[in-house]
Amino acid sequence: MIAIWKSDIMAKGLKKIGEDMKKKQKSIKINLIMNTIKTLMSLIFPLITFPYASRILGATGIGRVNYASSIVSYFSMFAALGISTYAVREGARIRDDKEKFSKFSREMLNINLCTTFIAYCALAVFLALPILENYKKLLVISSLSIIFTTIGTEWIFTIKEEYAYITKRAILFQIISLILLFVLVKNKNDYYWYAALTVISSGGSAFFNLWHSRKIVDWKQKKERLEYRKHLKPILMIFGTSVASSIYMTMDTTMLGAFRGDKATGVYTAAVKINTIVSTLIGTISATILPRVSYYLGNNLKKEYEKLMKESVDILFMIAIPAAIGMICTSDILILIFSGKEFLTGSTAAKILSA
């Protein structure tokens, strides 16, 4: 009887483990689907907005906005400081403990607010340079994205794998931005409105996130001592490894704007936009699995980790290679459809970026 009772308990335990594993696999699939929908919308959105904006504003207007954005991106990079990546990696390990997770989230936000303040101080000094006199208003508008990204704490929802919420919110503000684009951008002088619309989505998302995060994180400061020092070294290490790639992604636009002017920057932007659409789709896979990878490693689930990594690499190769070949073969047609004849000289850059 005892043996039967023990075997029954073991059977129930194994059944529960099996059910938990199925739920985890299902949640990964749902997360991937929701994140794919979000990514597809972020791909479709510029396919509608950029062709319209490029034809209304022309290469010069687009170039002015993107030159200003490229300058602001350096200050955004410092404000971010690798905090988001670190928060996702470490926060995923303690996400089931609300008290620890809330304390961790307060520490991350406070560090991020400090780096954001320093970034704005540096930007204020930078704006005094005479060479940027004609770009001051655009730089101020674009710089709003820095504080919006900080207070948005997107990493909280990535850690919690709330991709349904992230997707719905993103689609909502993309639709709002699209409507405002058609209403406000009517001629070549409306590039200030176009610059503002590029940050409206992040601004709205930030306030939504602040409201929604109260269900997940207890933001009230407790009597316990917040630990900042232990986070600084790993955050700076991540920042050090990411700074090179971040500069690589934006230095080309900044240098082009400084040496060749707004029109050349606008033409090059069309090539970059097309390349970004494809690379964003590929990057979705990595962004989706990162919280689960951290969770598996944090709980010493090596088999699940290895299986997930193998599947992810297979999918990446399956998408990346055909995408690169397709981009090289069709860049002329894509530039013409996507941006118009004025941007057609950017097709060579599109081919090089796709390789």
Identify the residue ranges that each predicted region occupies:
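Interhelical loop/hinge segments that connect adjacent transmembrane helices in multipass membrane
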Residues: 9-24, 28, 164-167, 191-198, ...
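Signature of the first transmembrane helix
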Residues: 26-84, 178, 198, 236-259
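Alpha-helical transmembrane segments of multi-pass membrane transport and lipid-handling proteins
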Residues: 40, 47, 77-80, 85, ...
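Helix-terminus/linker motif at the lipid-water interface of multi-pass membrane proteins
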Residues: 44-62, 183-188, 246-277, 291-296, ...
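Helix-loop junctions and terminal segments of transmembrane helices
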Residues: 50-51, 80-96, 271, 276-313, ...
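Alpha-helical transmembrane segments of polytopic membrane transporters and translocases
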Residues: 52, 63-80, 237, 252-254, ...
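Hydrophobic alpha-helical transmembrane segments
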Residues: 67, 143, 167-215, 234, ...
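Membrane-interface junctions at transmembrane-helix termini in multi-pass inner-membrane proteins
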Residues: 147-170, 347, 352-355
